[in-house]
């Protein structure tokens, strides 16, 4: 993994301090999980470089993200859903895949051309998904058109991707970049790598004839709403300028269990982003040289991105429509009185816990 410079992140400060807090918070989790069952699986449709396609999304239950076990990102609670012990056997992972195929067969008329596999960590990290399992999964889905696999930049390797590309699959690597601003990624998200590492991962993916889908995080902790929106606008454009990065998924933060963000939320120190902030970014970056989409998980709830409660579903539907059509005019069809409050926040807010609207 990339190493943080010791003059910035000495013991007891910076990432070291974040990791210490995160380990204590994560240690409160005493739930256990079945290693033969996937964390989640669902059918949907996604916009891809080949157009809108039916998709099967799989979240494999692995031993979880290596970085999360060291402490990890301030907002990410996915490791709490992972099997305890750090590893899941090949046979159990393939049983999970069988369950996902059964789920698809029961609910879809035809196999989905797009397969998206996440592990709440790194699919390409062989501690999570052994090479044997990676090859078996590539074989299981070799008749589909496109695969998306999740990974931190460190593990993006042309040899690993060849398991899929050699079978004729179009491949995209989903990288949780979170922001193009290194300081925000290090100090607010507590993610260890630099933007230069993302660029290197894009180059490695290109060498394997694969593409990259960047995942950005709107409003990590310690950023005000206007600062978070501006960071996303800059980050989308910077990602779109990297050769090989053809899609940017800009997703608002939600409050997950066993995270620093949850601690801040309960103490009045964090408010998830306004839903209005998402169209603001999507409209401003519609001319970027990449497909830009957003998926507001938990929209309309106090722990997820939300407006006033009256217009949340309408704004969410407009965002989903934009994802498929890439037409910003859909946002002009949605209005609500609470947009005036959001405008006020965007003009005047300077603190990250939104005291102006409390």
Indicate where each model-derived feature is located.
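Auxiliary Fe-S-binding modules of radical SAM enzymes
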Residues: 2-31, 37, 240, 253-358
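Well-ordered, non-membrane alpha-helical segments in soluble/globular domains
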Residues: 87-103, 129-137, 196, 228-236, ...
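Active-site-proximal loop/turn and secondary-structure-junction residues that shape catalytic pockets
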Residues: 121-123, 153-155, 179-181, 218-222, ...
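Conserved C-terminal portion of the radical SAM core fold
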Residues: 196-259, 278-296
